[in-house]
């Protein structure tokens, strides 16, 4: 039988305590980690209800876990903590997946990037009490690398889990400071690139990463346990440098020298060959460029947003003017875009985002409304009745021509937006629609405007009417997954929108109530007169069920 390589540490060696006085970590009587001015940002308060219940289930099932903040790229200098990071024994992966599903957590995957073998598993859950989304970053391996690719996988998971400590204030297990410091030091050292050396030679000050400074402060100059750990894992030369950095401050020169000492051991834990990591990183950089170029399709405040692996979701907000539709839509976008890639699509005919073809018409309308009071009623958007006077017939012909141009431009825009909705949903994105095309009420409320011309004696007008109605008929097949109907009494809507006529509001509210969708679409009626907080909470619950 072949002997193991000299750099492979036996499992018992990795699980050996760091020092005689170091606690085993699994005892609940262990003191919580100390806090101070330098580590105030690293302290985690009591976990939310969803996370607390999840941790209780893990403890009941005797699954070893610990909170792990070993990824500097998730916690940049100016970034706020994005959820909870935990490390779990990979032998319990199936049991953990079942527990997460029972606890209400849903899987999310990174957008526009290939799977990373050393990466994390991201889960999301809805906190029912406050309506916020809880993020959970689950890892089974300890991998190091930059934000695009993990290059090394350190087999130190048994050591981390066997030396964990119970943070009684946070109510969860955390990593031993000595283990966390050594891991962070290795990560920072192997993250140094040629650019880091050039900036250092040019005199640019090197700033020690925040998380490494926090763990360094918690060690309080006690280099004994971390030096012993470094000697066992990386060798005597690396241990001497670690002792100097714990007693003093991690500097660029010492970190670079530490890298030289650790290279013979750490390079044996590479995930790829020497050239493999380089071309994979280049390919991922191209993916990032492609993602940035497609930002028009997937507008999200966070470029590292997640997608739904089970398929995207389209959500449509319907409601008359004064129902609070715009306010609720903006709030929903802000709530979702912090965790998932979201795409807002405006299907209305007002002043919202429009196509290049309809934009000049909106500008012309804006100018005409200042000069002609009759334009405020937008006569080109409705059909006119018969008239006998020559002047009236001439005016009707002009408005009919304007109506034709407007209807064609609007149909062209809706056709493109329906294509965008289909592409985004097929890619796993969440699409939030302001209004939605309908084919049940012509000449009204996002319906076709030229249906009355389908029986016109002129063949050209019949063809235009047929072409204009195509996207509205297509919308009957490309239906949203969730339709939220916002209902409000016409008098309440008029108080919110004084410029609207009461009869018009009544007509629109009746049309919203009469809209019907296929069985595959979930339709929810919402009383928009309730307090905003209650309406928002109900909308969030409905949206979360569909994701």
Predicted regions and their residues:
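P-loop (Walker A) phosphate-binding loop of NTP-binding proteins
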Residues: 320
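NTP-dependent small-molecule kinase module
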Residues: 263-287, 485, 490-547
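Conserved lysine of the Walker
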Residues: 325
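Short beta-strand-centered segment that lines the nucleotide-binding/catalytic pocket of NTP-utilizing
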Residues: 339-355
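Hydrophobic positions on the alpha1 helix immediately C-terminal to the Walker A/P-loop
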Residues: 328
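A glycine- and Lys/Arg-enriched "phosphate-lid" helix/loop adjacent to the NTP-binding pocket
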Residues: 430, 435-514
């Amino acid at each position: 039988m072949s002997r193991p390589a000299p750099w492979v540490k036996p499992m018992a060696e990795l699980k050996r305590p760091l020092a005689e006085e170091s606690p085993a970590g699994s005892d609940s009587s262990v003191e919580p980690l100390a806090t101070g001015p330098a580590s105030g940002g690293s302290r985690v308060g009591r976990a939310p209800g969803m996370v607390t219940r999840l941790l209780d289930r893990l403890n009941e099932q005797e699954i070893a876990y610990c909170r792990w903040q070993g990824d500097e790229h998730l916690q940049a200098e100016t970034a706020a903590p994005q959820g909870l990071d935990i490390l779990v024994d990979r032998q319990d992966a199936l049991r953990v997946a079942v527990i997460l599903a029972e606890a209400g957590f849903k899987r999310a995957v990174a957008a526009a990037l290939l799977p990373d073998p050393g990466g994390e598993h991201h889960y999301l859950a809805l906190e029912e009490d406050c309506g916020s989304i809880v993020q959970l970053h689950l890892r089974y391996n300890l991998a190091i690398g930059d934000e695009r690719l993990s290059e090394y996988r350190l087999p130190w998971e048994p050591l981390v889990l066997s030396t964990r400590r119970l943070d009684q204030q946070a109510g969860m297990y955390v990593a031993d400071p000595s283990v966390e410091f050594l891991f962070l030091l290795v990560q920072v050292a192997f993250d140094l690139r040629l650019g880091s050396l050039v900036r250092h030679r040019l005199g640019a000050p090197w700033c020690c990463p925040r998380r490494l400074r926090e763990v360094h402060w918690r060690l309080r100059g006690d280099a004994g346990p971390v030096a012993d750990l470094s000697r066992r894992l990386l060798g005597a030369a690396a241990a001497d440098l670690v002792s100097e950095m714990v007693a003093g401050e991690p500097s660029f020169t010492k970190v670079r020298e530490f890298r030289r000492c650790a290279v013979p051991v750490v390079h044996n834990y590479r995930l790829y060959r020497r050239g493999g990591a380089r071309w994979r990183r280049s390919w991922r950089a191209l993916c990032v460029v492609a993602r940035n170029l497609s930002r028009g399709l997937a507008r999200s405040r966070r470029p590292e947003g997640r997608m739904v692996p089970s398929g995207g979701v389209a959500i449509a907000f319907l409601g008359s003017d004064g129902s609070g539709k715009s306010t609720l839509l903006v709030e929903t976008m802000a709530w979702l875009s912090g965790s998932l890639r979201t795409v807002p699509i405006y299907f209305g005919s007002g002043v919202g985002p429009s196509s290049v073809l309809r934009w000049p018409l909106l500008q012309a309308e804006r100018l005409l409304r200042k000069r002609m009071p009759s334009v405020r009623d937008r006569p080109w958007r409705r059909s006119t009745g018969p008239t006998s006077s020559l002047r009236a017939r001439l005016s009707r012909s002009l408005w009919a021509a304007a109506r034709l141009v407007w209807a064609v431009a609007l149909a062209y825009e809706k056709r493109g937006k329906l294509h965008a909705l289909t592409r985004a949903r097929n890619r796993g994105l969440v699409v939030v629609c302001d209004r939605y095309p309908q084919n049940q009420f012509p000449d009204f409320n996002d319906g076709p405007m030229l249906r009355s011309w389908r029986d016109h004696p002129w063949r050209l007008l019949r063809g235009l009417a047929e072409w204009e109605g195509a996207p509205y008929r297509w919308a009957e097949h490309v239906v949203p997954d969730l339709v939220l109907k916002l209902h409000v009494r016409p008098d309440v809507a008029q108080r919110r929108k004084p410029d609207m006529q009461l009869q018009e509001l009544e007509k629109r509210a009746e049309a919203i109530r009469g809209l019907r969708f296929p069985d595959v679409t979930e339709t929810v009626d919402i009383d928009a007169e309730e307090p905003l907080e209650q309406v928002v909470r109900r909308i969030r619950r409905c949206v979360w069920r569909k994701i």
